[in-house]
């Protein structure tokens, strides 16, 4: 007998299960909403980077970002940059600035100690350390010329054990940024010549700072150089949660990836061929930019590049979008202020506008010379007493018959020394038979200038005539005349835009203009002396995308009639030698503006390279790479440094932007995009708006 089941047997258990699950969900929601995630104290952060470790000193990090990362934690400055606000704030000292922005007075915080301090033998940070750090920079033997330049003319005085005064000759709005460099202890380099400080290995590989982390040790493993830092307790500011920070420095990214399971962060993540960051599994990517730009700097010391129309034409002919696409970048810029200006035609890629600007320059395509001459001949023949149409003739007979009006002639007038005769069938007209056999007045093969003269030998008019006996040559000449008419209509705007032609659409073959074919080689522009427009572009091997950009520039400018030779020195030292010598026409290079966008070092004429009979007079710190000189720009750069308010600053920046826009000393291309990767369980990472790669550690106190 079949069994029967009652539905009520299942309803009650199901309701109980549903009630239980709902309770769990509500309990979890309550827990999440009422729980605050509190950072755990301790732990070790291990970061991998690619590079080479050098002595760890704040004075000498400009060329080594890997060093700068470690130095930023071991050493602290009087001031620090806040990537969240973009402002300079107090760090080891409070800062007071006079109303005239010429006196900067710092007062060290209380209870500041160097890392070699012990309970029995504390080593406090004093004004003597401040004096030592900055007066050493001012010494003429100090090898970091860029850093030294920041303190030229600055008077530094000790006011007390904790107070130091910096007195400037001129107001300088951004001077506080110079006080972010890490302090060094007085006496740490006793016996070391100032010129050799960058080689002080004993201190450099066992540094003593006053930063949030102290140097613990360094070991060389099979895969990397490993530097260990330990948290150093300080009596001010936020407490850091991480007990240790370990930096593993690998020779290349492949070796780094082989150790990825032991890393919590990767400093700079490379990209694949599609431009995507190669993010390791279980890592989070944080992308950021720095106040940097990559540009093409025109060496305006070169007389060729003093032609503004030429520089403008090259800018208009540079396809920035194609460049950033090819190297997998994203951020196009048009100005040294890291801006893009889509409203100004001078920044828009337009090959026709580029040709137009170059048309007005001192450099001409060979076809332009022919075009101008042909247009002049056409204009000459279209007016006056002697109007010859067409200009080109296919004449194989013994004479070429021409006719004209007697309105401007008299009896006895001649054309090419051949007497004019009354026309037998046309009233008020003359006729002449010009020989082709070489006799007096003959019309010879090729170009002829006809001269109409009255009976007294006075010139009445002249005209051009081109003669050939070859039908193929005649067709080329006739095609040239057709193109001339089309060019005039294009110039006048009487044909639709898409049907217009420019000089770049023309090509010379056998001395005649024809329409350019895709298979035709590009012509190189020449000047009135017949010199070809050939420029040399200097760049570096690293980063490798610079060479790719250089090849693209060559490709972009070739149709404009500009030949580019690419110069990539094999060594860094050879490149720097050419850089100092200004041994280039165009330089593809990058510059960093740091936290304040102060462009003085890069565009003020005082930072041009000055050439004398002595090579020793050449400056390493001459950062005006375009050799650009402008009284207006100089004045604005000085005003920017002296500005009292943000409004005054922005007004001067806008005016400087306009001056550089008009002068085109460089073509600004893009601002690089970087990627930092860290494990997903690492909390508190906020990059903000860093000015240096190492600025990611300015929020390290929040990491856990």
Which residues fall in each region the model found?
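Short, well-ordered beta-strand elements
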Residues: 41-52, 103-106, 130-133, 164-166, ...
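Gly/Pro-rich hinge or "lid" segments in bacterial periplasmic/extracellular proteins
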Residues: 180-244, 254-255, 351-362, 476-485, ...
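Aromatic- and charge-enriched surface segment that lines or borders ligand/interaction sites
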Residues: 94-142, 259, 304-306, 311-313
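Ligand-site clamp/hinge motif
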Residues: 201, 231-278, 312, 563-565
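Ser/Thr-rich low-complexity repeats and stalk/linker segments
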Residues: 386-472
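Detector for C-terminal structural segments
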Residues: 21-24, 28-29, 317-346, 353, ...
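N-terminal lobe/hinge region of extracytoplasmic solute-binding protein
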Residues: 48-100, 135, 208-209
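Surface-exposed binding/hinge segments that line
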Residues: 144-193
